[in-house]
């Protein structure tokens, strides 16, 4: 964290730009699982409702992809790569064994998933009736879903046990996602740049990355608009609230950029 001279707390904000649909989906799922962690640890019916909303979104995201096989393939690829580092004297044998153990555990967990991801939820007619009704804006009131209203009025401990039963089968998927994203984020080298008058451009083959991570201080009231391909990277910083799409935040802005690849 950074502190300004007038004692106003400033933070460093990280923006992540996935450069493939596969990584974009993993980041979305990671965000949904984080929301589930946050809300499921609390007691109110509103927070437990938020858990179900996130669970239903996970179902929708995973229904349009072959996530299980993609994760298995990536974990096997990373395991093979890491096994090849055993003869490297600069690599900690203990740390290597630890990550390989995590990869093997996640791999086995994914193999053990029966059928489609989230099948235990899809087979629950009551949950699916709640999900269907929730697809209508504002349609989760007690007169829309009286049985769901009853569940929301049970003791928090009872609701939390139900939530645990619904969340736990996703553990192998989440473990695989965490491993892949952690390895991806740790694969890059941080470089410091300055966007002159809010604009930055760079050409080169290093932009063949899977993920870009940009860090900027919150003292600058702007956000980055990033476009990247294998030929060039363009970053334009715009005011965080603006009525003009072409407006640029015209100051020199220091930022940190990381190109991450698997």
UniProtKB/Swiss-Prot annotation:
Function: Cell division factor that enhances FtsZ-ring assembly. Directly interacts with FtsZ and promotes bundling of FtsZ protofilaments, with a reduction in FtsZ GTPase activity.
SUPFAM superfamilies the record matches: YacF-like (SSF160950)
The organism's place on the tree of life at top rank: Bacteria
Chief site of localization: cytoplasm
Subunit structure: Interacts with FtsZ.
Entry keyword set: Cell cycle, Cell division, Cytoplasm, Septation
A family per Pfam: ZapD
Annotated protein name in UniProt: Cell division protein ZapD
SS bond partners: none
GO BP annotations, alphabetical order: division septum assembly; FtsZ-dependent cytokinesis
Location in or out of the cell: Cytoplasm
Organism: Nitrosomonas europaea (strain ATCC 19718 / CIP 103999 / KCTC 2705 / NBRC 14298)
Gene it is expressed from: zapD
Similarity comment: family membership: Belongs to the ZapD family.
GO CC aspect terms: cell division site; cytoplasm
């Amino acid at each position: 964290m950074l502190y300004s001279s007038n004692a106003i707390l400033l933070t460093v904000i990280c923006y992540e730009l996935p450069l493939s649909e596969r990584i974009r989906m993993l980041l979305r799922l990671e965000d949904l699982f984080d929301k589930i962690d946050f809300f499921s640890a609390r007691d109110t019916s509103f927070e437990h409702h938020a858990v179900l909303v996130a669970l239903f979104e996970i179902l929708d995201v995973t229904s349009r992809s072959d996530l299980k096989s993609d994760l298995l393939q990536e974990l096997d690829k990373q395991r093979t790569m890491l096994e090849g580092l055993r003869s490297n004297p600069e690599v900690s044998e203990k740390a290597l064994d630890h990550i390989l153990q995590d990869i093997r555990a996640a791999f086995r967990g994914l193999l053990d998933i029966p059928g489609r991801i989230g099948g235990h939820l899809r087979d629950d007619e009551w949950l699916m009736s709640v999900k269907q009704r929730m697809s209508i804006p504002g349609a989760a009131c007690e007169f829309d879903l009286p049985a769901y209203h009853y569940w929301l009025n049970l003791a928090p401990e009872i609701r939390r046990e139900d939530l645990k039963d619904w969340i736990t089968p996703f553990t192998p998927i989440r473990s695989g996602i965490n491993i892949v994203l952690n390895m991806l984020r740790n694969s890059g080298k941080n470089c410091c740049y300055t966007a002159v008058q809010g604009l930055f451009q760079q050409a080169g083959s290093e932009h063949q990355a899977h993920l870009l991570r940009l860090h900027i201080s919150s003292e600058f009231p702007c956000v980055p608009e990033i476009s990247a391909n294998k030929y060039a990277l363009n970053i334009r910083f715009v005011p965080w609230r603006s009525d003009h799409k072409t407006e640029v935040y015209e100051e020199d802005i220091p930022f940190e950029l990381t190109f991450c690849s698997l």
